[in-house]
Structure formats: C-alpha cells, structure tokens
C-alpha cells in the first residue's frame, strides 16, 4: 500500500511501482491498495486487475502543523477509517511510490516484521540525540537507520504506523519548535525517519528484521535472492530519479541495459523518462 500525492513526479513514480509489480510477477500473489489525493485523476493512473484506488485528502492538508512536511502523507492515511480496506489481507508492504519490486518479492515471507534500511543516522550528533530521546521516552535503543518501508502482518503495521504518527508529532513539538536544523546533522526534513526508528523499537523491540527492502537503486551488483524491494534514493548516481526526471536517460540505449543488475533494472522498469 502507498499514498499518491498530487505531484507529477510521485504520480510518474507510482507507474514504476506498478510496472515492477507486473514484471516481477508480484501481481500473482498480491494486490495494490493505493490511497491518493482526491485531486489525482484515476484516469491518469494505471488500470490493472488487482489495483484499488481510494481517494483521501492528504494528511498535510488536513493538519496545519504538517503543511510544510508532505512526507507525513505516506503515513497519515493509516489513521483514517479508510485503512480498513487492507484489513482482509494477511500481510502488507507499506512503501513509497518511488520503489521497485523485484522478482524475489514473491518469496518474501518473514517470521518477523521486516524493515528496509535508512541513511539518516550517520552523524554522531544524530545517533546521540536519538538515544537521548529514546531514554526520555522509555524506549530501549538497539538499532540505527531503520528504513521507511516495512512488511509484516496487517494488524501490526497499522498499529505501528499509528505509533509512528504519534512520535512524529512528539518530535515536532519537542525537537523542532525553534528551527529545522541542518542535514546531515539533526534535521527536520527527516523527522519521520527518526520517528519511525523510535516507534519500531518501542513497538517491536528486538523482534524485527532489517534488510531486503529499500535496497539502494545505485547498486551495480546483481539482484540477489534477498533483494525484494528497491528504493530510489536521493542520489545522482545511476539509477537516479533526479536524472530520470530531468530527461538525462532519454538517449540511453535500453538494449544495452542488464535488468539482472539492480541499477539497470530500475531504469529498465522506469523507462526513458519525461520528454
């Protein structure tokens, strides 16, 4: 499941997710439940059996404190009654739109809730601050750089995501009243990532896996059997969603791509990009 904002880049990237879902054969064992801003015309979205579209106002528009933080929309829909649309499923992958399922996604069946990996807690300042907050909130910190994508039992992911939202609000109120900070140090721009790490350790403790999701799109290794889901990271290395958006892949010889290689697979699925 994912949220499609009324943004042409996100709408285009949702197309990547759908094409990868089809090519990888994931459509055989899963459905896509896509929540979207009401302004998004579903006639502009892929029509495939197994895809359900549910309109819902963006969380950032309905809650003034998040007006300048659209990333909250990828979580906010879990707090609405409409999330009941996923309740009949056993498991769910909560993902962003700018992602690619691999042919191995069909084999993902972990015993524990599985997260991807992030890259927001590399500076000592950030690691220390997260540990201090965890202690203040009564959380035992174990992991760092827990990713944004998560796969697990539906009821667990719904509960976890609502805790995640609550922690986003707490961080906003306690840590970012007087400024936004500066990347790669303590920075409001990745507040939802900090909150996700704290929420994961609060709710799951040690009973979680990290890996197999949010694989680096810039990797030039072959897709491994435990690479289930690739994320388009913020990078100008191939594969780069920024270069894709700006048309820098328009002249690429697609016949020369090797879709068994992670970076090439992403471009092969995404296509040449906008004119």
Feature map (PLM): residue ranges:
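N-terminal anchoring/stem segment of glycosyltransferases
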Residues: 1-70, 81-89
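Short, flexible, basic/aromatic active-site loop/helix in glycosyltransferases
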Residues: 127-140
């Amino acid at each position: 499941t994912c949220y499609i904002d009324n943004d042409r880049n996100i709408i285009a990237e949702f197309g990547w997710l759908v094409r990868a879902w089809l090519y990888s054969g994931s459509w055989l064992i899963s459905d896509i439940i896509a929540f979207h801003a009401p302004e998004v015309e579903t006639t502009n979205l892929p029509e495939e059996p197994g895809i359900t579209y549910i309109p819902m106002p963006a969380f950032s528009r309905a809650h003034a404190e998040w007006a300048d933080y659209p990333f909250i929309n990828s979580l906010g829909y879990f707090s609405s009654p409409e999330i009941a649309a996923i309740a009949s499923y056993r498991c769910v992958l909560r993902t962003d739109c700018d992602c690619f399922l691999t042919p191995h996604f069909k084999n993902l069946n972990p015993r524990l809730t599985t997260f991807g990996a992030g890259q927001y807690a590399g500076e000592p300042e950030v690691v220390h601050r997260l540990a201090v907050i965890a202690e203040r909130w009564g959380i035992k910190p174990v992991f760092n750089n827990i990713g944004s994508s998560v796969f697990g039992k539906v009821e667990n992911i719904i509960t976890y995501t609502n805790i995640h939202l609550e922690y986003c609000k707490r961080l906003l109120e306690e840590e970012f009243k007087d400024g936004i900070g500066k990347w790669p140090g303590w920075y409001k721009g990745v507040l939802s990532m900090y909150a996700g790490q704290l929420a994961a350790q609060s709710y799951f403790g040690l009973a979680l896996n990290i890996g197999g999701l949010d694989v680096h799109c810039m990797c030039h290794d072959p897709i491994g059997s435990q690479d289930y889901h690739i994320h388009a990271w913020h990078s100008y290395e191939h594969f780069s969603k920024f270069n894709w958006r700006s048309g820098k892949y328009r002249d690429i010889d697609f016949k020369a791509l090797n879709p068994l290689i992670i970076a090439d697979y992403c471009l092969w699925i995404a296509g040449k990009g906008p004119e």
